Every structure is written in C-alpha cells, then in structure tokens.
From Swiss-Prot:
Name of the protein: Ribosome-binding factor A
Keywords: Cytoplasm, Ribosome biogenesis
Superkingdom of origin: Bacteria
Intracellular or extracellular location(s): Cytoplasm
Gene Ontology cellular-component annotations: cytosol
Lineage, top ranks: Bacteria, Pseudomonadati, Pseudomonadota, Gammaproteobacteria, Enterobacterales
A Pfam family: RBFA
Membership in a protein family: Belongs to the RbfA family.
UniProt cross-references to HAMAP family, sorted A to Z: RbfA (MF_00003)
Gene (UniProt): rbfA
One function term, GO molecular function aspect: ribosomal small subunit binding
Amino acid sequence: MAREFSRTQRVAQEMQKEIAIILQREVKDPRIGMATVSGVEVSRDLAYAKVFVTFLNVLTEEHDSDVVKNGIKALNEASGFIRSLLGKAMRLRVVPELTFSYDNSLVEGMRMSNLVTNVVKNDEQRRASTDHKEEK
C-alpha cells in the first residue's frame, strides 16, 4: 500500500511547524520582525531545506524591498542557530542546511484580489450609469 505523502513531505511539514515556533519564540533579531513560514522544500536526501517566509510588516506597509532583503539576510545569518534548535526539536539523523527565501505569493495574491475588486466596482458603476441613462 502506497503512502499518501513521501517522507520528505512529512519532514518538510514538521520543519515548517518547528521553524515557525523557533522564529516566534527564540529568534530575537529586530530585523526579522513578524516572519511567517509559508513553506519548506526539502531535498530528497534531507541534506538541504529551502524555507519560504513572508513578513507581516511588508503586508501592512508599501512593498519595501529593503525590509525583505534585511529580513532574509538576518534569517540566513541566524540559520545555524535555527538549525541547532531544529535539531533539538526534531529527531533526525542529519538536520538539513537551511536557506531562507522570500515568498511573495501572499503579496501578489492580495494585489490580484485588489485588482479584481476594483474591476468589479468599476463594472458596477458603469452598469449603474448606463441604467440611469436608459431611464431618462
């Protein structure tokens, strides 16, 4: 009977949970701020892991590339510390080497949602104005 998820996917899910907890509770770097782990990709041999993060302060402010660059730089500098805490939290023979990347899918999703909302509003206004003209 085949398993529903491969081992790498299960390890990636568990790593995502543990790294999120570590970032919330243990990492005190102010450059990181409110970082959210949106996904983890683990290599087949579990030697490398790419961690995708978003920053909540970027969502509330204008998309600021300096905040993102500084946050990713700080996370990559703290990757050894995060890796050591991850090794204590998870039972793995080899703890993967971590690299952090910015995940802009949430920002892009919000931008697309705003575009759709604006198009719907403009369409409703256009319909209302044409209906108003036809009544006259």
